[in-house]
């Protein structure tokens, strides 16, 4: 849990700030908060004692990456992280995460740290969700100290992954290997058109002669 504590402390000291906030939105054009969040993030930077890290999914449209990269360069306490880097490092350093409908939300909640989302589509929401970006700063203040928000995070940890022994990945791999031994590997995956398009754009098509 504390692998990145020294790096975090150094970053906060260099900026003279108290907390790190990670903005990690989804790449999906229909679900991403990127078109709406910049003004609210700038207000949060201006009014609260934070360093803001921006970490986007590798499949995020380049125009959004370019726009936020340029914006971050004009903000003394904003750091744009290239999408090729692993988000886990920055999740471990962050005190609060801002997102929308990214799966990274659940990863961060399991660290027992607060999440704020904009227009999340999840059926069950165990974090602070806003539908107006003007409420971002208010939501930030709430998630830090509100007892109900803290209890929701505790519930997620207890019910989704109560194991804190550092061996979750070992268990997951063992279960996956056991499933493959019993059921084999599916010949095809059922993907929607957008997932197919982004996968092909990123990784290319697989030649039939190269298939297992």
Predicted features along the sequence, with ranges:
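Short, conserved active-site loop motifs that form the nucleotide-linked donor/cofactor pocket
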Residues: 50, 77-79, 127-128
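Short, solvent-exposed loop/turn segments at secondary-structure junctions
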Residues: 26-30, 58-61, 103-104, 121-123, ...
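A donor-sugar binding/catalytic signature common to diverse glycosyltransferases
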Residues: 84-127
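Nucleotide-activated donor-binding/catalytic signature segment of Leloir-type glycosyltransferases, i.e.
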Residues: 66-83
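Catalytic cores of nucleotide-enabled group-transfer and carboxylate-activating enzymes in metabolic
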Residues: 7-9, 20, 99, 106-107, ...
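Conserved catalytic-core segment of nucleotide-activated headgroup transferases in glycan assembly
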Residues: 1-70, 164, 169-170
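C-terminal "capping" alpha-helix adjacent to the active site of nucleotide-linked donor transferases
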Residues: 131-148
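C-terminal amphipathic helix plus adjacent low-complexity
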Residues: 144-212
């Amino acid at each position: 849990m504390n692998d990145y504590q020294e790096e975090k402390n150094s970053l906060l000291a260099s900026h003279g700030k108290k907390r790190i906030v990670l903005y990690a939105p989804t790449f999906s054009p229909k679900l991403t908060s990127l078109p709406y969040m910049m003004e609210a993030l700038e207000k949060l930077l201006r009014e609260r004692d934070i360093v803001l890290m921006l970490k986007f999914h590798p499949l995020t449209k380049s125009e959004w990456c370019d726009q936020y990269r340029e914006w971050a360069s004009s903000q003394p306490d904003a750091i744009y992280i290239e999408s090729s880097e692993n988000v886990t490092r920055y999740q471990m350093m962050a005190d609060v995460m801002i997102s929308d409908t990214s799966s990274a939300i659940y990863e961060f909640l399991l660290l027992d740290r607060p999440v704020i989302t904009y227009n999340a589509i999840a059926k069950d929401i165990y974090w602070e969700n806003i539908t107006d970006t003007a409420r971002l700063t208010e939501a930030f203040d709430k998630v830090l100290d509100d007892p109900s928000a803290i209890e929701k995070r505790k519930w997620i940890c207890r019910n989704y992954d109560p194991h804190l022994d550092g061996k979750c990945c070992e268990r997951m791999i063992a279960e996956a290997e056991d499933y493959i031994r019993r059921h084999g590997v599916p010949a095809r995956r059922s993907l929607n058109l957008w997932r197919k398009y982004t996968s092909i754009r990123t990784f290319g098509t697989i030649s039939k002669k190269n298939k297992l």
